[in-house]
Amino acid sequence: MSLSSSRIRLLDSATVNQIAAGEVIENAASVVKELIENALDAGADEISIETLGGGKGQIVVRDNGIGMDADEVAVAIQRHATSKISHFADIFSLASFGFRGEALPAIASISKMEIHTAKVNGLGSKTLIEKGEPVCCEACPRQPGTTISVNSLFYNVPMRQSFQKSPQMDRLAIRRLLENSILSTEGIKWTWISERRQELNIAKNQGFTERVALVMGEAFVNEAFLIDKRQNELHLTGFLGSPSMHRSTRQGQRLFINNRAVESSFISRKVAEAYAWMLPAQRYPAFVLKLSVPPMWCDFNVHPQKTEVRLLQEGQIGALLVEAISEVLLHRSPSLEEKMVEPTMESPLIENGGLEIPSIRPVAISTPLSCPNFLQQSFVETEANRALCKEQENLALPIIERVRFLASLGKVILVEDSEGVHALFVQAARKHLFYISLLSKRSDSLLACQMFLVPPTVQMTKLEADFLQTRLESLAAQGIELCRISPDSFAIESAPPFIQEEELKEWIISLAHEGAFQVNESFEQLVENTVQKLAFSKNTRAFDHSWINVLWQIGKPEKAFDGETIRRLVLEEDFM
């Protein structure tokens, strides 16, 4: 635009609505959110959603709320038309979801919309809207309630369309949104049909516990701790995840303030503070918490999508959270004495930074390297595995370089080759072996995977399971064979031998969890990041001595893929 033509002018209504749509409507899930909130505000107790193409093709939301007259529809598609407030001060005592009156006109401006609605004893009407303007309106009977169909989302804003994610990512976003709605409301029937297949069907009489089990998984509910604490005007209720079910991100946290799904870094920090002494570093608790506060204490008008919240009286709210959660965890968790891990030796532990070895007493003498024995109860010995074992036995004293086990000492294993004595750091070595076995894609017999005799099962949320289902072929190529046995669980049929069963389950959950939300990350990067974050055991009993030979065969690396020290020579300076 030239300077001569840059006159100040009023924007036309179509442009204004499309700009508003850019703030309110981020993707198909944003449309679903606005429409179901309108249905809830209309008093509906039965809401059904249908989506095609992840929502970009079609979104249909039906409800049995109070409905509208034809003249109300004409007003509803205009900006700032709302039945929720009449003055600005009303915002601070809201009990409804929507109140700006921007959503419906914003959606209508970037889609082809149809509104079919009727009030009790009303005639009913059907209105067609394109580019935010009504095209036609006709009488059309129906039961009381409203059906809004949104077709060809973003059809007239190609730039916005080009920035949209895949239909699969949109479906995952819609699922999380609907799961939050299921958790935040009771006595409401929810149905979701995606790509003509029913994904959710929640009855009115399904209680909060059943709904949490559906969303978070039965394993979460079975191990979670109930919390119910009242303090003056505050009420905290919900489920606290067992400390053993910690996650690598905060995405396992569901928070509802006054029945609205929100994100609050303040509340997340306070919950983490209560869990702090029970979780490893950089791990986060999972929870489903409902907090009721006086309406004037919270401002949901921070973000156009109303997912962020500002809170007054943070001191009082924070104190309640820490006190109530700490009390539950202390009474329900094992004592500290029970959780203590006894050291394997009296000698001081060896850290990566230096060696402190007052006396070295070998706890086992080197024996011919053999197949991993600590997994023999779980893995079935196949012909391929027997061949691998034989091969490893033959390679126990390789022509290139001999290596033998000397001793286990704290978190390290001491081994000897022609170069001298090496300190082998168990945690880093196992993590590196597991990671490169995934990269090898079964091409290297030294890193071959093994089948489970009795496949263990891993349970997660339905959202995470749906993501994992899309990556089964990629995982199988890496030696992780999974079979979906229920909507929220998988059986693990094979895996590399370098990871223990519980670690493997934790990694698969972390992979599914982060994959469902880190939509901009490649699968290869996702695998690397989740392996890097995984807390492998430092116990030397988790490291089979045959793996020493494997490490030497692949070049006895000094550093793992993430830069962590795998081994280093024991020098005279270490004893001085």
Curated annotation (Swiss-Prot):
InterPro entries the UniProt entry points to: DNA_mismatch_repair_CS, DNA_mismatch_repair_MutL, DNA_mismatch_S5_2-like, HATPase_C_sf, MutL/Mlh/PMS, MutL/Mlh/Pms-like, MutL_C, MutL_C_regsub
Keyword DNA repair set for record: yes
SUPFAM superfamilies (UniProt xref): ATPase domain of HSP90 chaperone/DNA topoisomerase II/histidine kinase, DNA mismatch repair protein MutL, Ribosomal protein S5 domain 2-like
Biological process (GO), any one: mismatch repair
Keyword DNA repair: yes
One Gene Ontology cellular component: mismatch repair complex
PROSITE patterns hit by this protein: DNA_MISMATCH_REPAIR_1
UniProt KW keywords: DNA damage, DNA repair
Single GO molecular function: ATP binding
Alphabetized NCBIfam families for the sequence: mutl, PRK00095.2-5
Family in the record: Belongs to the DNA mismatch repair MutL/HexB family.
Role description: This protein is involved in the repair of mismatches in DNA. It is required for dam-dependent methyl-directed DNA mismatch repair. May act as a 'molecular matchmaker', a protein that promotes the formation of a stable complex between two or more DNA-binding proteins in an ATP-dependent manner without itself being part of a final effector complex.
Protein name: DNA mismatch repair protein MutL
The species this protein was found in: Chlamydia muridarum (strain MoPn / Nigg)
